Every structure is written in structure tokens, then in C-alpha cells.
């Protein structure tokens, strides 16, 4: 189960690297200034979280490590809850593909949680 969860975390990370690139392209169209700088900062943060989630999935979640479970649960939850509240709920992005990231997040959490239950049973 934990390896399935790790695969979903890796997919989540790859999707968010793609999303970071899309936001970067949005930033390139802005006039140089504070708005462009803040967009680029958001790109940096999103890409960093995506890389961290992938690394944790490969190094820890794949082997059902409890520390990896909590790390990726926290990283992905904070990221996707903000996305849901500030982008999806406000309809700045259509539900599809807007809910793809949260769907991968829920599946990753579900399977990694099942994996944690197995080692405790």
C-alpha cells in the first residue's frame, strides 16, 4: 500500500512541477515589478515543495517510513488546502483539471495511511 501511496505522491509532485512552469509562463507576461516578483516567488515555492514531496516519496514513503508519512502529509496538505481555498473555490480554474492535484493528494494520503496501518497491525 505504501508504494502505491508513494507513486501518487510522485505523480502529485510532477503535476506541481508542471503547474510551477505554467505559473512561470504567466509571470513572464507581467511587467517587471512587484507582481512579477511575487509570481516568481510562488513558482519557486511550488517547485521546491514539489521536489521535496518527490524526494520524500522516493526515500521514505516507498519504504513505509513513518517520518516520510508525516512529512508528505504536511507538505501536500498545506499546499493543496491553500490551492483549493484560493483558486478552486473561487473558480479561477475549471474543476477539471483543477481537482487533479487534490485527487492525487487524497489518493496518496489514503494509500500511505493504509500502509501505516499495515505496519501497526
Regions inferred by a protein language model and the residue ranges of each:
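Membrane-helix boundary connector in multi-pass membrane proteins
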Residues: 80-101, 115-121
